[in-house]
């Protein structure tokens, strides 16, 4: 850019920067969304623009000064004949910031609705400082919101939260409208009037106890916010508020901030609060296990109590159901069919033991010798001496017929059943009503185990001595192939004196195995095994001989060693060193 000569009032410097600033620098990296290319797209383009568009040089800040290029100010009597050229001058007035200190005209209209700023209501215009005549701000004689004086010492919420609702029947809005108040609604304290003359040493107080119909319900101040007044208002005394239990909505019944649909929901909330009063011990240990869920909705019962005139009907929440212990019932059998409302099975004649030679209608010669019920009754009523010999003959004949005709293997000892005890009519009382399942069940439990006699072989000796069945009638009888030697010898000595009476009164009993042994199955229906006593095991004697304390004593005696003395100087093994010294130095 060329310098224009002939202008002494202009400086010889060019305005502008030789380097393009990043503010005006634009390309695809800095302005990716710029659609049109500006003339200052690059450094080369900027230099080209400076050369193509020459600019006039400006004076030394003439346009930026508050003065300017002005004619020379001289008095009229001293002015020259020809007008001198204009010179740079600022004049004799100092304008400062170039404007008036206080505006003399009306304030400029500001449209604040177009922006988010708001105009101040205190000052007349939007200036930051008021005018000198209005600078004296007066006190506002109006209450202003404050916090409670003890706000830092009061919890915001309840320390022990409650479930009380504004629609509660006993502490809500309905209870506060009743006169007189119920005992569950607190009331305000009585008004106190203090009569004290200045200078008088005595203090007089007048207490006004209003009637119950004129009492007012207790309400804590500061439900919304606390207000304070200047000291010159209300006899120059500040307002002191009582300390509420909480700062956030202290009166739940005055301002129903929670939405409640009906009084039924309020009753449920109150019962829910009372359910939390139960201790964990009372909840877990009720005598019948843990407590069942509580019935919180008893609004219908309370409405009925109110209609019937019951006063103070407010029971504790009760359990929805109580656990009960039921006696176990068998899954199969006659009792199970009766409890399931099924048709009971018909009583059938007991089928004799299976035999290959027997048919469903004709029995083999072996099973035809089993005594009938008439013979059993005769034996029970008429105890004759000849029956004993007849019974021995029957047994011998049974053995012979079984060995000749039957193909079944003959056991070592044939088990003959004590049919007298099976058909004892007096032990089973008659029950006409078959639907009384409990009587049938307990009759089966009261049955004693059916004894079965056994005639022993004289050629077998057992090597395991067991208890005799004569002394323990409820013990299970040993297996017929494991009879004791003492019993055999005793039977040999009593063979001469053996009678049918002794045979019925002192039999050797066999255990009744209803699952595996078919010949010992009774001729009655199914009998539960709950009342059948079990045999005594020989392990009980071994268990009684064991003593835990003696075993521990023997263990300690076996591992007891001689106590070592730390004062002894050990030449071998582990040394007893303490802080570099042997232990015997500390005991000398």
Curated annotation (Swiss-Prot):
Residues recorded with modification Phosphothreonine: 219
Statement: the UniProt record of this protein carries the keyword Secreted: no
Domain of life where this protein originates: Eukaryota
Free-text disruption phenotype from the record: The testis size, weight and histology, spermatogenesis, and sperm morphology and motility are normal in homozygous knockout males.
Compartment(s): Cytoplasm, Cytoskeleton, Microtubule organizing center, Centrosome; Cytoplasm, Cytoskeleton, Flagellum axoneme
Phosphotyrosine modified-residue sites: 441
Residue list for modification Phosphoserine: 406, 421, 427, 457, 484, 516
Known function: Microtubule inner protein (MIP) part of the dynein-decorated doublet microtubules (DMTs) in flagellum axoneme. May serve to reinforce and thus stabilize the microtubule structure in the sperm flagella.
InterPro entries: SPMIP4
PANTHER family membership: C5ORF31, CHROMOSOME 7 OPEN READING FRAME 31
Keyword Metal-binding appears in the UniProt entry: no
UniProt GO cellular component terms: centrosome; cytoplasm; motile cilium
The name this protein goes by in its record: Sperm-associated microtubule inner protein 4
Alphabetical keyword list: Cell projection, Cilium, Cytoplasm, Cytoskeleton, Flagellum, Phosphoprotein
Expressed in which tissues: Predominantly expressed in the testes.
């Amino acid at each position: 850019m060329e310098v224009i000569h002939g202008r002494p009032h202009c400086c010889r410097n060019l305005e502008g920067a030789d380097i393009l600033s990043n503010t005006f620098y634009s390309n695809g990296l800095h302005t990716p969304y710029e659609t049109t290319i500006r003339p200052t797209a690059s450094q080369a383009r900027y230099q080209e623009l400076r050369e193509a568009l020459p600019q006039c040089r400006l004076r030394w800040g003439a346009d930026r000064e508050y003065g300017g290029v002005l004619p020379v100010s001289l008095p009229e009597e001293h002015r020259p004949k020809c007008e001198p050229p204009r010179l740079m001058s600022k004049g004799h007035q100092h304008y400062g910031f170039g404007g008036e200190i206080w505006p003399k005209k009306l304030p400029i209209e500001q449209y604040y609705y177009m922006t988010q700023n708001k105009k101040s209501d205190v000052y007349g215009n939007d200036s930051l400082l008021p005018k000198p005549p209005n600078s004296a701000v007066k006190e506002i004689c109006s209450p202003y919101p404050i916090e409670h004086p003890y706000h830092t010492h009061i919890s915001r919420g309840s320390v022990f939260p409650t479930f009380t609702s504004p629609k509660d029947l006993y502490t809500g809005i309905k209870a506060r409208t009743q006169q007189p108040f119920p005992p569950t609604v607190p009331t305000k304290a009585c008004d106190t009037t203090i009569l004290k003359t200045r200078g008088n040493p005595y203090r007089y107080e007048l207490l006004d106890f209003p009637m119950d119909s004129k009492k007012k319900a207790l309400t804590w101040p500061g439900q919304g916010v606390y207000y304070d007044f200047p000291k010159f208002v209300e006899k120059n005394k500040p307002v002191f508020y009582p300390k509420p239990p909480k700062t956030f909505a202290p009166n739940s019944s005055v301002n129903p901030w929670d939405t409640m649909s009906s009084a039924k929901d309020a009753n449920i909330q109150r019962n829910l609060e009372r359910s939390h009063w139960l201790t964990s011990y009372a909840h877990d240990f009720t005598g019948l296990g843990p407590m069942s869920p509580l019935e919180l909705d008893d609004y219908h019962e309370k409405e009925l109590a109110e209609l019937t005139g019951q006063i103070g009907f407010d029971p504790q929440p009760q359990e929805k159901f109580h656990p009960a212990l039921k006696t176990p019932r068998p899954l199969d059998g006659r009792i199970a069919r009766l409890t399931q409302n099924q048709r009971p099975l018909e009583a059938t004649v007991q089928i004799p033991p299976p035999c290959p030679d027997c048919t469903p209608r004709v029995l083999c010669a072996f099973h035809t010798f089993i005594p009938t019920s008439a013979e059993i009754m005769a034996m029970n009523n008429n105890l004759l001496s000849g029956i004993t010999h007849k019974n021995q003959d029957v047994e011998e004949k049974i053995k012979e017929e079984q060995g000749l005709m039957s193909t079944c293997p003959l056991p070592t000892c044939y088990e003959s059943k004590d049919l007298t005890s099976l058909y004892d009519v007096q032990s089973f009382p008659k029950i006409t009503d078959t639907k009384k399942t409990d009587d049938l069940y307990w009759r089966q439990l009261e049955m004693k185990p059916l004894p079965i006699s056994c005639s022993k072989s004289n050629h077998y000796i057992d090597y395991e001595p067991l208890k005799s069945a004569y002394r323990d009638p409820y013990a299970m009888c040993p297996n017929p192939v494991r009879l004791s030697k003492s019993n055999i010898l005793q039977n040999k000595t009593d063979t001469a004196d053996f009678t049918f009476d002794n045979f019925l009164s002192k039999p050797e009993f066999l255990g009744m195995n209803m699952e595996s042994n078919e010949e010992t199955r009774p001729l009655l229906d199914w009998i539960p095994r709950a009342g059948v006593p079990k045999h005594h095991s020989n392990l009980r004697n071994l268990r009684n001989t064991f003593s835990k304390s003696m075993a521990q004593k023997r263990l300690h005696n076996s591992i007891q060693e001689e106590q070592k003395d730390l004062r002894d100087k050990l030449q071998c093994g582990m040394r007893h060193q303490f802080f570099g010294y042997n232990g015997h130095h500390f005991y000398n």
